[in-house]
Amino acid sequence: MKKMFIAAAALAVVALANAQAPADAPYAVKSGVYTMSMDMMGNEMITEYYFDDYGKKTATVSEGGGMMMMGGDQGGKTRTIEVEGVQYRVNDEAKTATKMPDFGGFSGGFGGGQSQINWNKLTDEVKKANNIKELGKETVAGVECTKYSMTMESMMGSMDQTVWIYKGIQLKNEMNSDMGTFGSTCKKFEEKAVDASMFALPASYKVEEFQMPDMGGFGGF
């Protein structure tokens, strides 16, 4: 019995070693899903984030209404994925996809305030460039997060943010800019396996190029 216990313990150690995140991984969690809630002009927008391979594969699923401004579908659910460096908005019900342009690192889908910073590999250079300061620990969605303040430059101007990070994953944020104050909060977080199809674009789907929506009186832009 003792030998069996030692063997089992050894196997557990080996399994843990094999499960370590790669050096360049965005997250320190292998796979999972978390649900973010964001207030969009008085309406709650729910976005589900799926990830695998320690954050190297990601997908978001949102209700269509909040995606209208950036060329998404106006109804139903929209799945956003990246395939070979290109972002696609996928409507699985209609079996269609929209190939999105490069917004220069800006997430056009109001992605819960997710930033482009690799919080799992936070360097002194990144901290200095974004004026990042650690504020302590707080619990969000049942897990302990590290709280940071920061200032970022984006296409919307200078933006002050407070973010809550769990193993590289941003589970809460509050943003202040010239356009106002907004943010998002994780309502549920689960570490679990995610089906590979969540990150794939079926070959049978019809793919269309992104079309900038008609902005009416803003034709001068």
Name what the model sees in each region.
Residues M4-V14:
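Sec-dependent N-terminal signal peptides
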Residues A21-F221:
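Extended soluble regions of mature proteins
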Residues A15-A19:
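Sec/Tat signal peptide C-region and signal peptidase I cleavage site
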